[in-house]
Amino acid sequence: ISVAATDFVMNSARKRNPFALRNYMVGYWKTFGVLSVLSLGALWWMAPWLLAVFGPSYAEGSSVMRLFLVGSLGAHLLRVPYGHLLSAVGRADLNTYVNGAVFLATIPLCFWAIPQWGIMGAAGVMAAMLWVSGGMYALVFEIHLRGQRQD
């Protein structure tokens, strides 16, 4: 998040250059995609041990933690960078629309999943929504770029 915030001014200056903004994302994925997969993979592997530090009853939650890690990967790869890019190009309003749509979809999905699978259902819905929102951000950003003229 801090990198995206640091690059905000640079990306704002490039707001009418779709090629530069797409290249920014490729560079982001080359660096932070690899780092995200490696760090979240390490946490996945260490989940039972990390939770056992808090007591034996927490160790049972490793499957929930792992599900949240899958969702976090979606946030790291799509949701965060595209959300910041939308703000940088002056389209923070699109962030609001995507968040509203995801929120409205999450409510009925949780009402369905929690009675079926309990905490795993809630974790699954939240993890899926991080990926869905990231995909929506990417789609909305691409639509925005295609509407721009090339400088």
Question: Residue locations for each model-derived region?
Answer:
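Interfacial segments at transmembrane-helix termini and the short loops linking adjacent helices
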Residues: 18-19, 26, 45-73
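Residue-level recognition of transmembrane alpha-helices
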Residues: 32, 65-68, 72, 99-100, ...
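Helix-loop junctions and terminal segments of transmembrane helices
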Residues: 1-16, 82-88
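Membrane-interface junctions at transmembrane-helix termini in multi-pass inner-membrane proteins
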Residues: 72-98
